[in-house]
Amino acid sequence: MAQLYFYYSAMNAGKSTTLLQSAFNYQERGMEPVILTAAIDDRAGVGKVSSRIGLQADAHIFDENKDVFALIQSLNQDKKRHCVLVDECQFLSKEQVMQLTDVVDELGIPVLCYGLRNDFRGELFTGSQYLLAWADKLVELKTVCHCGRKANHVLRTDENGDAIADGNQVEIGGNNRYESVCRKHYKAALNMGR
């Protein structure tokens, strides 16, 4: 029975690596996955899912206007699709999350979404908010803070490495702009303690 999965974490937990491994597992068995990624994330090139360890795959892109149900339905009519893998799912809209529930419920195709739970301000991304509410399975992928604790927050830093508390929710970047930290060090970096 198909289900909607949300694999979430802070940055550098291996979300894209896990997605690419899942795609490989399906392909190795002669099955056809659909890989989607956010158009806004062009760090490896538009329409590419790439991991820090060098794995990469082509992907269909989505932006805020893409009807992901229609895309997957069309692809499935051309050739049977066995799963949908969504990278950078935090950038999905509420409507797109609901469309993915329709992919599961109406088309019977499992959907595995991978993304950040919260932004650098400690607030949920829209896609993550609705995946937390609507996913059948929630799976936390873990990474570690510099202190060894589980990192569950992301700090955005400026060119001097100082934490930033304000700004646009979305600013594409990697290790040069973001650091995954535990709650204690997140609060300390932003002077949020007592």
Swiss-Prot record:
Q: Which residues cross the membrane?
A: none
- Chain sites annotated for binding ATP: 9-16, 87-90
The record's subcellular location field reads:
Cytoplasm
- Binding-site positions, Zn(2+): 145, 147, 182, 185
Tell me which EC number(s) this protein carries.
2.7.1.21
**Annotated catalysed reactions:** thymidine + ATP = dTMP + ADP + H(+)
Q: Which InterPro entries does the record match to this protein?
A: P-loop_NTPase (IPR027417), Thymidine_kinase (IPR001267)
Sorted UniProt keywords? ATP-binding, Cytoplasm, DNA synthesis, Kinase, Metal-binding, Nucleotide-binding, Transferase, Zinc
Example GO molecular function: thymidine kinase activity
Active site per database record: 88
Q: Enzyme group, top EC level?
A: transferase
* Pfam families named among the record's database cross-references: TK
Q: GO terms for biological process?
A: DNA biosynthetic process; thymidine metabolic process
The family database entries (SUPFAM superfamilies) matched by this protein are listed as:
Glucocorticoid receptor-like (DNA-binding domain), P-loop containing nucleoside triphosphate hydrolases
Task: Give the main localization category.
Answer: cytoplasm
Assigned GO CC terms: cytosol
Q: What family is this protein classified in? A: Belongs to the thymidine kinase family.
What does the subunit section of this Swiss-Prot or TrEMBL entry state? Homotetramer.
Please give the NCBIfam families that the UniProt record associates with this protein.
PRK04296.1-5
Q: What is this protein called?
A: Thymidine kinase
